[in-house]
């Protein structure tokens, strides 16, 4: 028990040291941004993110720095990751939309249905569906134990059943989008999509910095993508940042 307690104290102490280091690095990155050293600031933010310390604020600042440095694709990727963590943050959504409007060429756009689904995170939809299910289950048990309550609980039970069905259906859609779909954001000035996953293949189309493409397939260090106009081609992975479904 004493060894366990000592180990716990060591972990807490190490965690506090890590938090202090992150806070210091974050302040240093903010100073670089304030001084107009946007590329250096973006690198500093990314170094913190690579330690596993993820937050929407950190990603948002990183995205701002990337945009100021002229890196549209990297900015969009960081904004998208920040939006994934805080989907109802109006400032993140506004900045993302602003940068997306700077992108040239065909790019995929989020439709209204996806935008509505994105108002909650995948975990929040999961909690909503689970909460509705257990509330319905509790009401059904209460009706069995106390039959006299049945008339008063009938309407409420119908409502919770409807909520359970609806939230479960939405959760299924979110799960399909979250686990089965990906978006690739072009992070180079120009990326030539080819008809096959090799350099000698014929050019299919050209995507500009910041273009968002649907990921269709993968082969070695190549991904097959489709742009907003429906054109399909293969791009080297090094020219894009692949994001999971929202």
Language model: regions and residue ranges:
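Beta-loop motif signature
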Residues: 34, 186-215, 219-221, 239
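Boundary regions of SH3-family modules and the immediately adjacent low-complexity/disordered segments
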Residues: 72, 157-188, 195-198, 202, ...
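Membrane-embedded alpha-helical segments of integral membrane proteins
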Residues: 105-145
């Amino acid at each position: 028990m004493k060894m366990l307690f000592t180990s716990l104290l060591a972990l807490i102490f190490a965690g506090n040291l890590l938090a202090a280091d992150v806070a210091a690095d974050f302040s240093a990155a903010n100073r670089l941004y304030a001084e107009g050293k946007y590329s250096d600031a973006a690198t500093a933010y990314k170094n913190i993110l690579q330690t596993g310390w993820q937050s929407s604020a950190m990603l948002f600042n990183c995205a701002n720095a990337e945009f100021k440095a002229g890196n549209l694709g990297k900015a969009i990727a960081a904004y998208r990751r920040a939006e994934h963590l805080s989907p109802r943050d109006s400032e993140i959504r506004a900045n993302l939309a602003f940068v997306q409007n700077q992108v040239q060429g065909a790019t995929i756009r989020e439709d209204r249905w996806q935008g509505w689904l994105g108002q909650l995170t995948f975990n929040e939809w999961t909690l909503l569906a689970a909460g509705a299910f257990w509330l319905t289950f509790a009401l059904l048990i209460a009706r069995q134990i106390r039959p006299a309550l049945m008339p008063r609980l009938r309407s409420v039970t119908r409502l919770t059943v409807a909520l359970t069905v609806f939230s479960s259906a939405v959760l299924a859609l979110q799960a399909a989008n979250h686990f089965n779909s990906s978006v690739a954001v072009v992070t180079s000035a120009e990326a030539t999509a080819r008809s096959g996953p090799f350099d000698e293949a014929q050019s299919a189309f050209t995507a500009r910095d910041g273009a968002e493409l649907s990921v269709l397939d993968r082969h070695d260090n190549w991904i097959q993508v489709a742009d907003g106009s429906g054109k399909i081609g293969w791009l080297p992975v090094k020219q894009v940042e692949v994001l999971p479904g929202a």
